[in-house]
Amino acid sequence: MTERKSYSSNKFLLELPYLIEVQKASYDHFLQANLQPNKRLNAGLERVFRDKFPMQDAKGLNVLKYEGYFFGIPKYTITECRERGLTYAVDLWANLTLQVFEEDGEERRLKEEIKNEVRICELPQMTENGSFIINGAERVVVSQLHRSPGVSFDETIMPNGRSDYKSRIIPLRGAWVEFNTDGDMLYLVIDRKKKMPATVMLRCIGFETTNDILALFYKDTETVNIKESDINEYIGRIVFDDVIDEESGDILVYANQTLDEKLCEVLNAAGAQKIVLLSKDAEENHILIHNTLKADKCKSREDALNAIYSTMHQSQEAAPNMATAEAYFKSLFLEDPQKYDLGEVGRYRLNAKVYTKAFEDRLKELNLQKPSLDTMTMSHADFLAIIDYMVGLYNGSSGFSLDDIDHLGNRRIRSVGELLANQLSIGLTRMQRVIVEHLSLKNEDENQTPRELFNTRMVSTVVQSFFGSSQLSQFMDQMNPLSELTHKRRLSALGPGGLTRDRAGFEVRDVHYTHYGRLCPIETPEGPNIGLISSLTIFSKINDLGFIETPYRTVRDGKVDMSVEGLKFLSAEEEENKIIAQATTPMDEDGNFVVDKVKAR
């Protein structure tokens, strides 16, 4: 056997990995073909089916259920497909059950149950080499490097030198939510609709009154006895709580009003006993919330829910009733994973970013809790945490940081399995609309089977279109074995949901310090795609969340740990607080550095 020679200054401390694992592992995880239907994880193809089923009519009298999928056998071999210009694929089948109910008073009774094995589509199979044979040609699906779901915080310096901050919540599916400062105001924008004061969201999640909102951000207050003090000395201060006339029950001064001469006269004339004001320090630190509340025309939770309802429907009319407005708000963000889904990555990043130790302690006082990593929708605590973070950024408080969108902690890989799952989801969504319509129009005496309801062509068209014409599905580079291997490890920032050449600026194309050990800083095409097409380094790998990890050796007391335990794979986010030395630093065979000073970052 030929011995491999190494001319590097330091010996390899790690065996070369399986270089096309990025393709093979992703597709295997998507198919889960070797697992029994009841043992499959809620991921890939299984997750697509679970998300779309059951399908039913409006009354719930006809229900189409999913009970697992299986694959057929390829009709032709890889060689036959190449020679005859065919696609190397297998049929995807699903076990579907149509349950027909009949109304029995207020209850519903099962009338009949029809089970069928239904052909969903023809699914191209990956070869042992990590490629696909489509119409006789060998193709590769390039992995996509895209902006990760979750929350991000940005800063814009205005021409007058003022800093405006923006937070953006990006879900996998659902409405985008933005909170941004404009001067001394904090605004909420949902799905690029009309902006509204951010305190509208606080009222919607249960902090209904102005005093409730002030209590969230202003801890230091001062109670003034009006009878014993000259109230005029406090002109210009902000009122913390409503002052109520004890005799009539009328509100003399509202919370968040700024005390002036006119209000002082009203208090003295009514014989008010005391007034609670914000301390001077609190006023200076939280002017953002004070100004936002002043602009907020909503005075109750009902007003706030109606404001969101009318804004999203782009009308001046309120919801027909409170129940409709509340149900709409909950389905928009809180309770319906079909309409709003952060995804595992989005939830992980949101929890890691905004739930500081101090904020978690505050949540306990409010009887709220940090959502678990299984929670895919937004929660009341999430909205409060993001608004609190925005206030911290505005005030310049310590512990609050901005995000770098080019940092690899904010960008993740969508490999072939995830890309194909997204396409199948689109196809099944189209099919779902047709099936629900058929079920709604179905007569009681009409005996339809699941096979008759399902139109295979609608899903097949989406899959064929993806492999045949998607920007990420490319003819494999077969100049030589090395170029073939390189093509399978290539990453693209282009494609659906990614960047376009025209709007990709210099920063996103440039080499970033987090690329070290993860992306090759040299291998990128010249021309309009420069910096947008890149390649994985040899030892980098992609973790379960889609972030790129690279191996490091731990160093203790100036000695490199050469053991298996000393090897750590770290993502860009995990290495942030670590000191990283260059891999080319000279050392002896035992792992001791042979120089006194080491370059590190």
Predicted regions and their residues:
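Flexible, glycine/threonine-enriched loop-and-boundary segments that flank and lead into catalytic domains
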Residues: 114, 490-521
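Hydrophobic beta-strand positions
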Residues: 243, 521-522
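N-terminal non-catalytic structural scaffold regions of very large proteins
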Residues: 1-492, 537-601
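Active-site proximal loops enriched in glycine and acidic residues that flank catalytic Cys/His/Asp
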Residues: 523, 534-537
